[in-house]
Amino acid sequence: MVRILDGIPVRLLALMVMGLLFLCLEAGYRLSHRKPGLGDVSALQASVLGLVALLLAFSFSMAADRYSLRRSLVVKESNAIGTLYLRVGYLPEPSRGEMRAWLHRYTDLRLEGHEAANEPALFAKKLQESKLLQTELWSRLETLAPRIEAPVLILVTQAMNDVFDVGEERMAAAHNLIPTTIFVLLLIGMLCSGVLLGYRPEAPLRGLLSWSLFVVILTAVMFTLLDLDLPNRGRIRVDQEPLRSLQEQLRAHP
């Protein structure tokens, strides 16, 4: 399911949040000078900030778990393709050479696709090409099945299933994001804390320096979380080095 947040550029979203936080701080300041009567404002400020911190910690934990899963699946896919490549060596020629060439191409497509995850059209194109190669590999194995021994067929079939399965696992992990509801709750908590921090009936002037620090730090933390959660945009990306290393190994030992 595509979230609303995914369709908005990160910089624009950051500017919007910063603007909203400044507006909430200003609203709290003006409210405190029009109706100065809120008693335990400091206790309320601490409570709301504590809730925001709790939500941030919970969200970071979720995002970190998802990021770790995506990273481990890269290793798993690399190992699965490498195992299938070796087991294809049990098959007779010319199928062995053709299937290994297809696995070379399959590795290239998987690597190129995930490295271009921030370009949806190119990513979809590479993914579709890799699925066509999966069909070719499976069809060739079905053709060979009557002519090869059962133990060899079982080994190759299991390895091929693992390659196909981990590809689907990576797609599922890429779409397993923190729910939009949590980000909305986090934003509401941040805006409420902005109103409460701006509520300063004893202060004749606005605390622009403290306001700026509050807005910049809170926005930076929230968008680091968003960057960590989204695999197809931002600066925090899953390293594709295991697939890159496999690609080099396959080229060195065809």
Sequence positions of predicted segments:
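Hydrophobic alpha-helical segments
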Residues: 1-4
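Alpha-helical transmembrane anchor segments
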Residues: 6-35, 172-254
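Loop-to-helix transition at the N-terminal end of transmembrane alpha-helices
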Residues: 37-49
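Short, solvent-exposed segments of well-ordered alpha helices
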Residues: 43, 64-68, 72, 124, ...
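Transmembrane signal-anchor/signal-peptide helices with a preference for the extracytoplasmic
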Residues: 55-75, 229
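Short extracytoplasmic/periplasmic juxtamembrane "stem" segments immediately C-terminal to an N-terminal membrane anchor
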Residues: 74-90, 239-254
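Structured inter-helical modules in multipass membrane proteins
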Residues: 84-175
